[in-house]
Amino acid sequence: MINWQVIAQLVSLGVIVLVGPAVIILLSLKRGNL
C-alpha cells in the first residue's frame, strides 16, 4: 500500500523548501528595483 499522507507531506515540504527562497529572492529583487 502507498501511504498518500506521507507522500503529500513530503511533496508539500519540498514545495515549501523550493518556493520559499525563490519568493524571498523575487521580493528582494522587486524592492531593489523600486
From Swiss-Prot:
Its membrane topology: Single-pass membrane protein
Main subcellular location of this protein, as a coarse class: plastid
This protein's UniProt keywords: Chloroplast, Membrane, Photosynthesis, Photosystem II, Plastid, Thylakoid, Transmembrane, Transmembrane helix
One cellular component term from this protein's GO annotations in UniProt: chloroplast thylakoid membrane
GO annotation (BP), single: photosynthesis
Residues annotated as transmembrane: 6-26
Coiled coil location: none
Pfam families (UniProt xref): PSII_Ycf12 (PF05969)
Localization annotation: Plastid, Chloroplast thylakoid membrane
Cross-referenced InterPro entries: PSII_Ycf12_core-subunit
Family: Belongs to the Psb30/Ycf12 family.
Function: A core subunit of photosystem II (PSII), probably helps stabilize the reaction center.
Assembly and binders: PSII is composed of 1 copy each of membrane proteins PsbA, PsbB, PsbC, PsbD, PsbE, PsbF, PsbH, PsbI, PsbJ, PsbK, PsbL, PsbM, PsbT, PsbX, PsbY, PsbZ, Psb30/Ycf12, peripheral proteins of the oxygen-evolving complex and a large number of cofactors. It forms dimeric complexes.
Protein name: Photosystem II reaction center protein Psb30
Source organism of this protein record: Porphyra purpurea
